[in-house]
Amino acid sequence: MLRNGNEGMSTIPGFSQIQFEGFCRFINQGLAEELEKFPTIKDPDHEIAFQLFAKGYQLLEPSIKERNAVYESLTYSSELYVSARLIFGFDVQKQTISIGNIPIMNSLGTFIINGIYRIVINQILLSPGIYYRSELDHKGISICTGTIISDWGGRSELAIDKKERIWARVSRKQKISILVLSSAMGSNLREILDNVSYPEIFLSFPNAKEKKRIESKEKAILEFYQQFACVGGDLVFSESLCEELQKKFFQQKCELGRVGRRNMNRRLNLDIPQNNTFLLPRDVLAATDHLIGMKFGTGILDDDDMNHLKNKRIRSVADLLQDQFGLALGRLQHAVQKTIRRVFIRQSKPTPQTLVTPTSTSILLITTYETFFGTYPLAQVFDQTNPLTQTVHGRKVSCLGPGGLTGRTASFRSRDIHPSHYGRICPIDTSEGINVGLTGSLAIHARIDHWWGSIESPFYEISEKAKEKKERQVVYLSPNRDEYYMIAAGNSLSLNQGIQEEQVVPARYRQEFLTIAWEQIHVRSIFPFQYFSIGGSLIPFIEHNDANRALMSSNMQRQAVPLSRSEKCIVGTGLERQTALDSRVSVIAEREGKIISSDSHKILLSSSGKTISIPLVAHRRSNKNTCMHQKPRVPRGKSIKKGQILAEGAATVGGELALGKNVLVAYMPWEGYNFEDAVLISERLVYEDIYTSFHIRKYEIQTDTTSQGSAEKITKQIPHLEEHLLRNLDRNGVVRLGSWVETGDILVGKLTPQIASESSYIAEAGLLRAIFGLEVSTSKETSLKLPIGGRGRVIDVKWIQRDPFDIMVRVYILQKREIKVGDKVAGRHGNKGIISKILPRQDMPYLQDGTPVDMVFNPLGVPSRMNVGQIFESSLGLAGDLLKKHYRIAPFDERYEQEASRKLVFSELYEASKQTKNPWVFEPEYPGKSRIFDGRTGDPFEQPVLIGKSYILKLIHQVDEKIHGRSTGPYSLVTQQPVRGRAKQGGQRIGEMEVWALEGFGVAHILQEILTYKSDHLIARQEILNATIWGKRVPNHEDPPESFRVLVRELRSLALELNHFLVSEKNFRVNREDV
């Protein structure tokens, strides 16, 4: 329970806190828990024992800095030292040894693996324990089942069949009598009957033969093994059989873990100690008792809701890293055992460190983690498109991944919003497409209880004691606790304590919405944004938008590109500052002092007599090819305080998030250029660099050794290439810094040696070999060339040389991209569109004061989409622009009074009209609209038009990366049709529906060309080029295209032969021809 002393007001927690807390738990507890499980390695023949101790382990500071790890493609990790003991005969050695490196989380909440920023997503899984459900079969008979889920995700089912016999289904195929299972777990029949509530039901179904099978534990284990492993014949009881059963069944299906034990005790009213984390016979019997009670009506039909958050748990970064550490220690154990055997063969005296030092052993830890980060679906490349994306990525929760659901098989119920999500998982923010509802985002106040894995939400406790003290206590409720509280919603969301609460308020109780007296309320919400994620909380007037459009908006804000000159929004929600702060893109002063000097690379600060150098990020490439850049914001000689902003990051202004630009928009049709979500823009946005962004692309090349053993060479001396293409290379063959490069230019010159074959020798070469014995070698040119669409300025070149023959060269090229036709823009209300035309500013519609409009949106995009928030935003933005004001508006302002949003907008427009003495800003006949003029003719438009200042973002979906054309290129090997996709230089596919469209117009010859010459007719497509160049007639071939041949071959594989026959008109002779 948390309490704030002053007024009980709660502050928003740090958005990256969840990742940091998880990693700290792994370092402080997870490492110790796994080291405690490490067994003592003994070799009885030679009286040797090796042991690791959980206490006193140490992590050294990383040997390299973050920047260098990224620069040199290394892993940012820390060396782990553990206390070890080696008993060798009578000699006991204790030593602190290094067992490898562990990746370390940086200040962004991410890891650097091989130079790439990666982040671990929280996974939401079904909690281990037991779950009951009852359903009717096709005959209307009730079927009750209980499912036991282990900590590893293994499932076992208890069920009662039509003959009222109780079975345990340990896998999909095998089912085993509950008596056999209990006996195999160590209970005899007398113990079973003494520990159940319905012994007569247990006695009713076993016959004499079955009773014989459970006479002893050994017989029960044999019976269980035969049925579980589907083995026939006479088996003999042995220790190896027990071990196999232990490994295959009991470890996978019966380990409940700490969380599972708590859930099992709570569900079945047991009092088994928490440290007993395995399934016991007592659990099985209690679970069967409950099932019998459900089936025969003596119990309550209380089905478990599998989608309720109380039945889910979060696997955070701590759990996943701890699992990998346990896996690495298991591998270390095997490696040490091998080393011990090797030591005795060589007859050398071992020490604890020499057992772990061999190269393969010492890198086990880091290779395990690198494999995990490279292959695990929830360890993702960190999304660095903009500061919002960096903040949001670590707060994602996903039902996907190992042990979870899949996009193709998940049901609608598992994707749906559940009442228990309130204040924990955002009801809006999820992905679109196949994974809708399976990936979500944590609400801004939610926190994870790392011990039990539940998501908690804060509330104000309304108790008599708190009312007397005039204090508010903040309580964090887990999903299973808030069912017992009356939680006030609606008007009680107000932040102002002076507002008198109504007598009757809407409330939530046990997943139902009620209206009850204020005196009966237990807790209330603490913040209007409490239910939303960061993305949803940045949408002003979200309550006026349809939820589908709010979802699109929260996704599209994460795709916004940082612009060259950022601008903060006129209308916001107030959460922009904390989002920018927690993204760590700005530089914050860690101590007070005085600025000595500042430039684009560093800031020098004098504090307590010391000079501190603070490095800045200058034009660094992000994972999404956007430009990360920090600009100093403090002049020389200025005194600064702790926490003050020293340098702004990309897409931040004054410490606030600034993803887009405030531009003048009009909602009106214009010559069809804004049909179907197209957007018409003014050329001012291009010429004044309003939507100009910088992008950095990385190109790399590596030298290797050929199969003949000769090394590749980086050089400027490349024969057969024009001098023009090599103009930017320095004497080493690498492009110069600051060069302007165009498509096709050589960035790094490289030659690969090739030994010429005997047949390719020319006469002179043969003579040289005969006289001097010289081998003639030819070199193939394998240089790094700039691909299509890559033109720009070289801003950085990295030469990484690990050994003389292994050289990697990376070239970074900066591109300046203005907005152009085909780029995608969007507002913060899901109103997205593609630029269709860029008009000269004199042709754009203009206002009554002569200001030309910047963007023209289609008004038909508003009513059907029901995202009316954009109308409020644009009108209030216009008022704010004229009054030089910024607004920060909390959602659901209708809780104060009806039509609060509309009243606010109209009052501000009226104030702006009065102060600027412009009556057109607020016209009472059509408030918010204005008569505007056609820029081409000067005539006013017939209808008044809605105008305003909207905050519009430029998205990362840009035409430069999408547009593609092909004349010739690669073909698929089987069908001989052009390959698919821009990356492969692919062609356009004319599919079935496109063929129908052409058939509808009767264009037979065009269709013939498309399906043969331009596609997969091998001979015809070679001849058509010749015919086109020389102006000859295109030949008409009778043989079929390649795809038809593929069809014939596929029919042959089904034993169907396809032939055609030519029948003579004269004598009706049949000439058979093969297809």
Curated annotation (Swiss-Prot):
EC numbers on record: 2.7.7.6
MF annotations from Gene Ontology: DNA binding; DNA-directed RNA polymerase activity; ribonucleoside binding
Catalyzed reactions per annotation: RNA(n) + a ribonucleoside 5'-triphosphate = RNA(n+1) + diphosphate
Cell compartment(s), UniProt: Plastid, Chloroplast
Record Pfam families: RNA_pol_Rpb2_2 (PF04561), RNA_pol_Rpb2_3 (PF04565), RNA_pol_Rpb2_6 (PF00562), RNA_pol_Rpb2_7 (PF04560)
BP GO terms, sorted: DNA-templated transcription
Major subcellular location class: plastid
Gene Ontology CC annotation, any one: chloroplast
UniProt keywords, alphabetically: Chloroplast, DNA-directed RNA polymerase, Nucleotidyltransferase, Plastid, Transcription, Transferase
Matching InterPro entries: DNA-dir_RNA_pol_bsu_ext_1_sf, DNA-dir_RNA_pol_su2, DNA-dir_RNAP_su2_dom, DNA-dir_RNAP_su2_hyb_sf, RNA_pol_bsu_bac, RNA_pol_bsu_CS, RNA_pol_Rpb2_2, RNA_pol_Rpb2_2_sf
Disulfides per UniProt: none
Function in brief: DNA-dependent RNA polymerase catalyzes the transcription of DNA into RNA using the four ribonucleoside triphosphates as substrates.
Subunit structure as annotated in this protein's UniProt entry: In plastids the minimal PEP RNA polymerase catalytic core is composed of four subunits: alpha, beta, beta', and beta''. When a (nuclear-encoded) sigma factor is associated with the core the holoenzyme is formed, which can initiate transcription.
Family: Belongs to the RNA polymerase beta chain family.
Name of the protein in question: DNA-directed RNA polymerase subunit beta
The species this protein was found in: Saccharum officinarum (Sugarcane)
Phylogenetic classification of the source organism: Eukaryota, Viridiplantae, Streptophyta, Embryophyta, Tracheophyta
Name of the gene: rpoB
